[in-house]
């Protein structure tokens, strides 16, 4: 991957961020308390084909039971706080204060969205990502109750398909995401997929 600091680590304007996504680049930080931000352009990119998403049987059962209430864009601050508060296996997080502010601005102008799982009136899990054209760039997810974030991911894939999106970018792949059909594609192939996704517009 390539990585370099932006001109001003404290300011990432929405226009700059969207231009970066349009060219296959996204920002990260080393840790939550590190004020610096760097740009990342991986040699291999994680994607989940919307027509190749796999839902494990146990999760299918959870979805059928309707344990969680799914909401969209109702609590952005709560979702990014949940994602930034690493616990357990996710004790470290890359979401620092400049990144929080940057994505809050994107949310305000309609280019950042959340999928939220609510249980008994409380936010139990969720995810957020960036939309541009017909692409959704998944950023992070969290869970406070078993399967909450997985249900959000399953809902996201269904929702994106309904709304006409053609690309779900996960940035990297993990064993967890591979269970759902995530795969790695070389940078050139990814950039071709991204170019096609940016040719149209889909509404989240």
Curated annotation (Swiss-Prot):
Keywords: Acyltransferase, Cytoplasm, Transferase. InterPro entries: Acyl_CoA_acyltransferase (IPR016181), Leu/Phe-tRNA_Trfase (IPR004616), Leu/Phe-tRNA_Trfase_C (IPR042203), Leu/Phe-tRNA_Trfase_N (IPR042221). Its EC number is 2.3.2.6. It is found in: Cytoplasm. Its main location: cytoplasm. GO terms for molecular function: leucyl-tRNA--protein transferase activity. The keyword Amino-acid biosynthesis does not apply. Pfam families: Leu_Phe_trans. One of its GO terms (cellular component) is cytoplasm. GO terms for biological process: protein catabolic process. It catalyses: N-terminal L-lysyl-[protein] + L-leucyl-tRNA(Leu) = N-terminal L-leucyl-L-lysyl-[protein] + tRNA(Leu) + H(+); N-terminal L-arginyl-[protein] + L-leucyl-tRNA(Leu) = N-terminal L-leucyl-L-arginyl-[protein] + tRNA(Leu) + H(+); L-phenylalanyl-tRNA(Phe) + an N-terminal L-alpha-aminoacyl-[protein] = an N-terminal L-phenylalanyl-L-alpha-aminoacyl-[protein] + tRNA(Phe). Belongs to the L/F-transferase family. Functions in the N-end rule pathway of protein degradation where it conjugates Leu, Phe and, less efficiently, Met from aminoacyl-tRNAs to the N-termini of proteins containing an N-terminal arginine or lysine. This is Leucyl/phenylalanyl-tRNA--protein transferase. It comes from Brucella melitensis biotype 2 (strain ATCC 23457). The gene is aat.
